[in-house]
Amino acid sequence: MKRNLHLLLIDPQNDFCDVPEEYLMTDPVSQKVVAPALPVAGAHADMLRIAELIARAGAGLSDISITLDTHHRYDIAHPSFWMDADGKPVAPFTIISRQDVRDGRYLPRQPDSLVRTLAYLESLEANGRYQLMVWPVHCEIGSWGHNVHADVRATCASWEEAGSRIAMKLIKGSNPWTEHYSAVMAEVPDPQDPATQLNRSFIDRLASADQIYIAGEAGSHCVKATTEHIVEHFDRTQLSKLVLLSDCISPVAGFETQYGSFLSEMQRLGVQIATAAEVLPDLLANQAA
């Protein structure tokens, strides 16, 4: 009997991939080469392995879901939102705490955003998952960096055409007032924006699968946050359905320890960890069923 095998690709986007020169594009306006905004070391190789897995055994996959980090240029986690005490720009990779804002070390550029910003930081820090990080502008809506890695896009397109079906796309991150690492819900859900709240239909879709293979970027952030939220809202007896494809995921540099701790905790809870080569036989068998 054919099994329901689901591939979840988390943010397989150009801005997160350390792609070689031939994958880059030239901006026709500036005539400059457009480079990834937040390249994760190893991500290009991860994408090639994912693409190969789909190309070789895609007929064994019942479903593919692709999450897309999706931001406006003006966003609470982008430099354009912030200034320092002297009114100067805030550099990417700056961590900003609620106390920093209360002390005036960093401030939102728009004064009328102060109260909401403080409330957000208070809620974020109370959750204990992340501090606010100012990232370079990335995955901006409409940009090359927002697009899916070329090899993954091509193999997913072939999978869609061969089966007359769609690879479901999940948009996250377009609310500029909250960070949205997880595809399940934002770090601080906005009560006025359902897109930031728990995506129960997505959880239910995953729960209906016999196996869920998880891959993408980055292991220290969006893969971690998404998987943790899935685990939180899954039946505890079903966690072995989840399989992290360890050679198709890489962490952001400097966050390797957090990624390692995440893998250890997931294993402890019953989530499986495997390589693409190790799951290939199951997909091929399902393809033939």
PLM regions with names:
Residues 45-48, 150, 197-204, 225-228:
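Short, contiguous clusters of charged residues that form electrostatic/catalytic patches at enzyme active sites
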Residues 1-170, 207-208, 232, 236-243, ...:
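Active-site acidic carboxylates
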Residues 154-204:
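Histidine/lysine/aspartate-rich catalytic loop segments that bind and position anionic ligands
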Residues 137-142, 192-195, 216-220:
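Short, surface-exposed loop/turn motifs that are enriched in glycine and acidic residues
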Residues 77, 180-183, 225, 254-256:
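Short, well-ordered secondary-structure micro-motifs
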Residues 67, 173, 215:
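Conserved residues at the C-terminal ends of beta-strands
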Residues 209-227, 231, 243-249:
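Glycine-rich anion-binding loop/nest that anchors nucleotide
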Residues 71-73, 174-178, 219-221, 250-251:
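Short, catalytically relevant binding-site loops at active-site mouths
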